Amino acid sequence: MSAEEMVQIRLEDRCYPVSKRKLIEQSDYFRALYRSGMREALSQEAGGPEVQQLRGLSAPGLRLVLDFINAGGAREGWLLGPRGEKGGGVDEDEEMDEVSLLSELVEAASFLQVTSLLQLLLSQVRLNNCLEMYRLAQVYGLPDLQEACLRFMVVHFHEVLCKPQFHLLGSPPQAPGDVSLKQRLREARMTGTPVLVALGDFLGGPLAPHPYQGEPPSMLRYEEMTERWFPLANNLPPDLVNVRGYGSAILDNYLFIVGGYRITSQEISAAHSYNPSTNEWLQVASMNQKRSNFKLVAVNSKLYAIGGQAVSNVECYNPEQDAWNFVAPLPNPLAEFSACECKGKIYVIGGYTTRDRNMNILQYCPSSDMWTLFETCDVHIRKQQMVSVEETIYIVGGCLHELGPNRRSSQSEDMLTVQSYNTVTRQWLYLKENTSKSGLNLTCALHNDGIYIMSRDVTLSTSLEHRVFLKYNIFSDSWEAFRRFPAFGHNLLVSSLYLPNKAET
């Protein structure tokens, strides 16, 4: 069996041996070169192997590409490391950082048109190289690699967003109608299947969707077609176990759980985010102030932690910096209030000041960092939940106490009600009530065409009055009951998240 014909690739004063057959198989550049019969491309030294001269490439990049070619384009085990240990090592005197090495590898692979290597890079996109790969894909016109990087950055959006290099790529759009890279990624996070998710200390039991194997899950997802709940497997951080009074909000399709207190200890400032794209929890920067029984609101791509137990200050979390900063405080400390975002501003309603009932609606403008008195109410409300659609705020549950001359009599001040407040017309509407259910200790989420409302605590001893699992349809102004409560449990939270489609996972 004859020895395989080798070719020497010369770059400056160094030569690299490579199989001629594999070179032609893997490199479109050399395949075209040999087929063309170009004399200047076929220089052979007397008595030695054929020599091909290359210019303008880097030695480390070329060596990695040729090692890949010599391996026959083998994909198994080929990983790009800081020094290219897989797919060919780099001499110690050529030690380089991964970004530089990656740049030179893509340059050489693109010049030599080694398509199989460029395709392999699609599976090598990582958090530490996705931004550089995206830049290189733009420079060398590699649409498949660019798309792979975009998909990866969508999945790991906040982790990518806080990297300094991101803002070099994410420059503002140059023409009207153009969308920035940041906006493209943010919009792509809102794709997939909208799913109702419940988080809590589930106990299983007769109300559980089915018997659990081992420990009950900490998160469940709701399947609307069958009206059943299923475990959403994830590793809940130990720091979140038995935490009460925390703030929660959805930002860029991440579920944030922030602050709170532990039954056996004091308040905490820790913050975590759940990424449904990876089904993983991440710890993010902690607040500057430990706080509990406060409101966490997402507005204009940031989070605002508002007030708390005997606390009036407000902090803003910017995921681009992974940092919290104090902003304008509440005019007064508030307790048992609620807050939500509406048309880019924050509205605070109800609760108590240190002296009396809070009858004011407060509005916070993030751009001016200023709180203003928006309106004064005739109805006092506390412990309510709030969500918004366009310019309308929906107030769910709570304990109502009417003070005006048109006070209406009701069977109970804490029955389950839904009211709306239009921030443009400043009109209140009393929409719906359920006199058999309590409006206290609830969690709710806006999901599809309605507001899903659940009790925070349900056990065998919980009365029917305090077992709530209802949907308020905002278009038909009607209640819709559900047959299945997720499970017995405490400290429950319901949210709406986009989960990846099965074909994407």
From Swiss-Prot:
Q: Which keywords describe this protein according to UniProt?
A: Cell cycle, Cell division, Cytoplasm, Cytoskeleton, Kelch repeat, Mitosis, Phosphoprotein, Repeat, Ubl conjugation pathway
Q: Which superkingdom is the protein from?
A: Eukaryota
Q: Where in the cell is it found?
A: Cytoplasm; Cytoplasm, Cytoskeleton, Spindle
Kelch repeat residues: 176-234, 235-282, 284-325, 327-372, 374-429, 431-480
- Gene3D superfamilies (alphabetical): Kelch-type beta propeller, Potassium Channel Kv1.1, Chain A
Has keyword Iron-sulfur?
A: no
Which organism does this sequence originate in?
Homo sapiens
For this protein, the record's PANTHER family field holds: KELCH REPEAT AND BTB DOMAIN-CONTAINING PROTEIN 13-RELATED, KELCH-LIKE FAMILY, MEMBER 42
Q: Which GO terms describe its biological process?
A: cell division; proteasome-mediated ubiquitin-dependent protein catabolic process; protein polyubiquitination; regulation of microtubule-based process
Protein name, per record: Kelch-like protein 42
* Upregulating conditions: Up-regulated during mitosis.
- Please list the residue ranges annotated as the BTB domain: 5-78
CDD domains per the record? BACK_KLHL42_KLHDC5, BTB_POZ_KLHL42
User: Where on the chain is Phosphoserine found, per UniProt?
Assistant: 43
Quote any Pfam family the record assigns. BACK
Described function: Substrate-specific adapter of a BCR (BTB-CUL3-RBX1) E3 ubiquitin-protein ligase complex required for mitotic progression and cytokinesis. The BCR(KLHL42) E3 ubiquitin ligase complex mediates the ubiquitination and subsequent degradation of KATNA1. Involved in microtubule dynamics throughout mitosis.
Pathway where it operates:
Protein modification; protein ubiquitination
One cellular-component annotation, GO: spindle
Q: Does the keyword Repeat apply?
A: yes
Please give the subunit comment from the record: Component of the BCR(KLHL42) E3 ubiquitin ligase complex, at least composed of CUL3 and KLHL42. Interacts (via the BTB domain) with CUL3. Interacts (via the kelch domains) with KATNA1.
